[in-house]
A protein has these predicted regions:
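Intrinsic low-complexity, intrinsically disordered segments enriched in polar/basic residues
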Residues: 89, 93-96, 105-118, 127-137, ...
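Short, T/G/N/S-enriched strand-turn elements that build extracellular solenoid repeat scaffolds
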Residues: 1-5, 16-24, 37-45, 58-65, ...
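Concave beta-strand-loop units of leucine-rich repeat
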Residues: 11-18, 29-39, 50-59, 70-79, ...
């Protein structure tokens, strides 16, 4: 069974259906609460640009259509991310994902990356592509982060609740930075071109804010 959401222009697949029935005009597909067979993905049209799995999906992603630009693998996915299409710009790795990200495994086209709730792997130098501009680190993440492991392309960086490492010498390209209530350390040596920072209210006297930077207290 499937239905078409005209507002989001997305085909939502709730039960098995033949992919020959999917119009080539469809560019956005969402699998809702099912575990599609691996060969289903091979049959997906190269016209599809947006692919979402809401839950239950936990299969390799090495044979997705080369046209995919946006991929949300859902909350159950916990597989290697090697072999993603070179066209991909947005990747959401959901709640269960906690796999090492190897150097060169993410496509060089990627600009937006969300690492989900359980991700807590070291970010090694070269593991994030030089195209990346937006990075959100999930709730559990508590690994050291430094200028050497983040590409100079990053402009937006968000830390999760458990993160509690020093953040000195972040890339100078960062313009937007967010911390949560869980951060217990002093915040210093911020990028000079920072435009906006979100910090806990108890940190307002413990940080040196660059000139003209907007501060949002939470």
């Amino acid at each position: 069974m499937s239905r078409y959401d005209s507002i989001t222009q997305t085909l939502i697949i709730q039960h098995h259906c033949g992919f020959s029935d999917i119009s080539k005009e469809i560019k956005k597909v969402e699998f809702e609460c099912l575990n599609p067979l691996y060969n289903w993905m091979i049959k997906l049209s190269n016209n599809i640009t947006h692919l979402t799995f809401t839950c239950c999906f936990d299969k390799p992603v090495s044979q997705l259509p080369s046209s995919i630009k946006y991929l949300d693998v859902g909350k159950h996915f916990n597989q290697s991310v090697e072999g993603l299409p070179d066209s991909l710009t947005h990747l959401i790795l959901g709640y269960n994902f906690n796999q090492p990200i190897k150097e060169g495994s993410l496509p060089s086209s990627l600009t937006h990356l969300i690492l989900g709730y359980n991700f807590n792997q070291p970010i090694k130098e070269g593991s994030l592509p030089s195209s990346l501009t937006h990075l959100i680190l999930g709730f559990i993440f508590n690994q050291p982060v430094s200028e050497s492991c983040l590409p100079n392309s990053i402009t937006h960086l968000e830390f999760g609740w458990c993160f509690n490492h020093p953040v000195a010498n972040l890339p100078s390209s960062i313009t937007h930075l967010k911390f949560t209530y869980g951060y217990q350390l002093n915040i210093e040596n911020l990028p000079l071109d920072l435009e906006e920072i979100v910090i806990p209210r108890n940190k307002e006297n413990l940080i040196k804010i660059p000139f003209n930077c907007k501060v949002i207290f939470i």
